[in-house]
Amino acid sequence: MSEKVAPLKPFYLVDASIYLFRAYYSFPDAFADADGNPTNALNGFAYWLCQFLEETTASAIAVAFDQSLTSSFRNELYPAYKANRDPAPEQLKRQFNWARDLTAALGIPVLSSSDYEADDLIASVAHRVCRQHYRVIFVTADKDIAQLLAADDILWDHARSRTFRATQIKSQFGVEPSQIADFLALAGDSADNIPGARGIGAKTAQRLLEEYGTLEGIYDNLDEICNLPIRSVVRIQNTLRSSRDTLFMFRKLTQLAVDAPLPAEPSQLVRGVVDEAGLNAVTGNSRLGERLAVRLRNAGI
């Protein structure tokens, strides 16, 4: 009689930044602390976090915050990285700090770094999670996270109630999860101000990766590319030849780091007890209100 295989437990890795940004621009600025500082992003995030915890009763969990909004290793590598974005308002930065404190007070492990982005911290945990025991559920709407998906993992855009598995990524992006970093390096990523290779769009990048697999594979077969049935293939070949170093540098931007320092091993990233004093301090100073504080305290327990 064969042994039953225990079902994989969910390990939730949450990108908090997107929910804070969404709340900042969608919640009314009538929410404020005692000094009149806006708390709309914090309120929106707190309500979302309540709903998420009540829905999942998550135990193995970590929440990542973007502390390195303009100071990550990518900015040092390529100063134009995300330079097309307006700086985060100071009022929002203050609320990021509150949201980190709130999350930690709820006993939830917090990830943040001045050198690595939230995506890198999530990637570093996912890389070290024991896949014999866990499947990772990435709670985010960030397309870059799709490159991390293993067979049993789920990318969950919670706010829009959409989920993606590794098998669905190719129909969504035209490439496999493992090729997303190469694809974005070639085709560019306007959201992060990465131009890609001049004249190589999404369709051409997909075709090249379908044929050769990786950026390395493309350059290993560079002399053969002129034989592919692609429009302006000779021009594309010449562009690739002259852009080699730049494209490999771009891939360092689009590929998530898996070696970021973590506060603990994944096995220790579990929800602990509520820090009552810490929770009271955050909810009191930010005027979140007693009703929301009670709901937060009991969420998912």
For the regions a language model picked out, list residue spans one by one.
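Noncatalytic, basic helical substrate-engagement surface that gates or grips nucleic-acid strands
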Residues: S2-V136, I145-R162, F248-M249, Q255-P263, ...
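Non-catalytic nucleic-acid-binding/docking modules located in mid-to-C-terminal regions
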Residues: A6-L8, A58-S59, D152, R165-I301
